[in-house]
UniProtKB/Swiss-Prot annotation:
Natural source organism: Centruroides limbatus
Domain notes: Has the structural arrangement of an alpha-helix connected to antiparallel beta-sheets by disulfide bonds (CS-alpha/beta).
Role: Potent selective inhibitor of Kv1/KCNA voltage-gated potassium channels.
Keyword Acyltransferase: no
Protein name as catalogued: Hongotoxin-5
GO CC aspect terms: extracellular region
Organ and tissue specificity: Expressed by the venom gland.
Length: 20
């Protein structure tokens, strides 16, 4: 699972952001 680099904050790069 690659982390979405589009997330501005690392805390936002969580499951909720992964759904985006």
């Amino acid at each position: 699972t690659v982390i979405d680099v589009k997330c501005t904050s690392p805390k936002q790069c969580l499951p909720p952001c992964a759904k985006q």
